[in-house]
Every structure is written in structure tokens, then in C-alpha cells.
Amino acid sequence: MDIPILIKNTVNPDLELWIGAFERINNAGLKQLGAIHRGFSSYDKKIYRNLPQWHIPIELRRRIPELPIFCDPSHIGGKRELVAPLCQQAMDLGFDGLIVESHCNPDCAWSDAAQQVTPDVLDYILNLLVIRKETQTTENMGQLRNQINDSD
């Protein structure tokens, strides 16, 4: 049986452990894998519920480039007012999609009420997103760096 499997990041910022989960599931014969980045637990909850530590999913992309990576801005932010800017940041960083918590009446939700948005707000957020097209490949960037070095 080959069904889609989405694997959330580990609670602690441990890329090797996260990659190990993909390897184990893949070795069991399940090949339709994707990642969900929900941020990482921290004692410091001043801004985010879970620290984004964007470098970890970026490194995951570098190590497993064919793996779709989705961002969960609801769990990273922990507050509905952070969902929109985190959605845009995830898109700017090249994530493949978003998983956003939505509820018709978020304040009455049984769990995670503070981080949920209404379907109308979600529609508004999604319509505001700027999806940037890749304009440079890694090869092009290398060529540009060489040109800069040559001119220095």
C-alpha cells in the first residue's frame, strides 16, 4: 500500500531525527512522503508558540530536494494574528504549501482556539499571499558570484 504520509517535525530541533523518520517510513515501502514544519518547542514563548528555526526545513530541502515541505503557521505562531505573516514568510522561503487551522467559530474550538482563523479570514490571507517565481537557479547564482568575484 502506498498512501501519502506527512511527517511533522520533531518537538526538538533535530534534523537527523526528522530525516530518520523519513528513512524508516520509506524503507517500509511507503514512498509518497511529505514534511510538515510546525516549529520547535522552546521555553521562550515571547513571540511564537514554537520557534520557526527556518534553517532546519531549509536544510531538509537541501538534503531531500524532492520532498514536499508544508508549513503550519498556526502552530508556529500560536496566535491568529501571526498566521498571515508566517504564511507569507513560508511562501517566500519556498515551502510547497500551508496547513492552516480554521474553524467557523475559533474562540469556541475545543483545542488551539487562539491560533485558528475563520474560513473567511483564511480566504483573505490566501488571496493576499504573494507567490514568488524562482528567477535564479543555483547554477545562475554561482555564475553571478563568479562575475562579482572577477570584477573585484
Located regions from the model:
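Catalytic alpha/beta core domains of metabolic enzymes, predominantly
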Residues: 1-105
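Short amphipathic alpha-helical patches
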Residues: 21, 83, 110-114, 145-149
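Short, electropositive alpha-helical surface patch
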Residues: 86-87, 119, 151-152
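Generic signature of intrinsically disordered, low-complexity segments enriched in small/polar residues
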Residues: 98, 113, 127, 143-144
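C-terminal helical cap(s) of enzyme catalytic domains, especially alpha/beta-barrels
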Residues: 104-138
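Divalent-metal-activated hydrolytic enzyme cores
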Residues: 135-151
